[in-house]
């Protein structure tokens, strides 16, 4: 007969096998990056102590008392030689919270810290918080900018009506957080990201103005705004620096992912684009670059997507979605792109600064018409014929 302790032992062995599983790159990629065979984090990776009561008297059937649904949309930072993710963990009750998971190499063996982050509340408590972007700012703090969701009390009869604001917190150890007032804006805001450097002596934010909680409405794309005081941040003026366009991957909406990476050629940006299709909304990742001298000036934008859901990545709570709000650039130029698939699990893809800059600078842009797309393909065919005939 299997005893309670036998079940616990087997459960821990199964969990450890999952946590210690080695990850390997998938062969035959696109040359831009390498995806990896296994997700790096799933709901099953969360600590057993978060889910099980290990007291046989109060839990004789060894049931999960608190179930986890997903691990997704994680901020990322290199910290004390470790690769850290501030993960959005979603419970079975639909409430999201933040928790730190760390890895020695950035691609596998991610393990959560003992407890979730205790995030101080705003003056007006939020129902849900999620999708943190981490920025190690030159002012010495690590900032977390995330979405704070509350019910829209202006529509008391609609239980799905919600508001979205950009919440701001800062820390120096990723354990103790100081909550600052939410970013004051003229419209709802999601996907807000703090630029890592001062610009003209001010804090700079990438924004995404929108009319509704889901729909962007008149919001034109990824915006840019300067703020005098981060402790009472208010956006009075913003301008669109990366716009939406008809019949593109960012037709319906787009948003900045993590903060951009500084290179000697310009700022590398990772963003998500959304278009409508017969099955709903399709989320993909794309890139663009901005000038070092003027971070609002786009200097390169390759046409189409960089990364899309493939194979099992397509299946999950919200189908046909990839989303990224964290990446890490190592000192040797290697880049770790952390992305979630279908609002369910976390993955990693690796590349280099040089490859991503080459991709941005030398991939044809979208000229918004089929004719121009065909002309580019024919020009490449002609070039290859000439090259291969030598």
Regions found by a protein language model. Name each.
Residues 328-333:
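Well-ordered alpha/beta subsegment
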Residues 1-73, 77-127, 136-193, 197-252, ...:
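Beta-rich carbohydrate-recognition and catalytic domains
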Residues 336:
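Short, surface-exposed ligand- or partner-binding patches at beta-edge/loop junctions that are enriched
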Residues 310-314, 322-327:
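Short glycine-rich, acidic/polar surface loops and turns
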């Amino acid at each position: 007969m299997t005893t309670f302790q036998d079940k616990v032992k087997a459960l821990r062995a199964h969990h450890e096998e999952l946590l210690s599983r080695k990850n390997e790159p998938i062969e035959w990629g696109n040359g831009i990056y390498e995806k990896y065979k296994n997700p790096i984090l799933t709901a099953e990776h969360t600590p057993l102590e978060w889910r099980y009561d290990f007291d046989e008297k109060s839990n004789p059937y060894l049931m999960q008392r608190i179930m986890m649904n997903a691990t997704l949309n994680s901020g990322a930072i290199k910290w004390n030689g470790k690769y850290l993710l501030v993960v959005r963990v979603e419970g079975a009750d639909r409430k999201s919270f933040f928790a730190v998971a760390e890895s020695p190499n950035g691609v596998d063996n991610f393990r959560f810290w003992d407890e979730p982050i205790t995030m101080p509340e705003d003056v007006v408590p939020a129902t849900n918080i999620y999708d943190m972007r981490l920025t190690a700012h030159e002012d010495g703090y690590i900032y977390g900018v995330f979405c704070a969701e509350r019910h829209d009390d202006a529509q008391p009869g609609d239980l799905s009506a919600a508001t979205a604001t950009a919440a701001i917190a800062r820390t120096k150890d990723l354990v103790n957080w100081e909550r600052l007032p939410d970013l004051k804006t003229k419209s709802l805001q999601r996907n807000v990201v703090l630029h890592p450097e001062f610009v003209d002596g001010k804090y700079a934010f990438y924004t995404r103005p929108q009319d509704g909680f889901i729909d962007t409405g008149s919001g034109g794309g990824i915006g840019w705004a300067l703020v005098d005081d981060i402790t009472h941040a208010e956006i009075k003026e913003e301008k669109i620096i990366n716009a939406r366009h008809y019949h593109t991957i960012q037709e319906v909406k787009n948003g900045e992912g993590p903060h951009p990476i500084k290179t000697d050629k310009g700022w590398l940006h990772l963003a998500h684009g959304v278009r409508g299709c017969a099955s709903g909304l399709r989320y993909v990742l794309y890139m663009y670059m901005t000038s070092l001298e003027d971070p609002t000036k786009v200097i390169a934008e390759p046409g189409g997507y960089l990364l899309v859901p493939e194979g099992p990545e397509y299946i999950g709570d919200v189908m046909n979605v990839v989303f990224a709000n964290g990446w890490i650039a190592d000192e040797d130029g290697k880049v770790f792109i952390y992305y979630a698939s279908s609002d369910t699990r976390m993955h990693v893809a690796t590349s280099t600064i040089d490859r991503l800059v080459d991709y941005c600078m030398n991939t044809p842009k979208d000229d918004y018409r089929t004719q121009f797309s065909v002309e580019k393909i024919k020009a490449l065919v002609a070039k290859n014929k000439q090259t291969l005939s030598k």
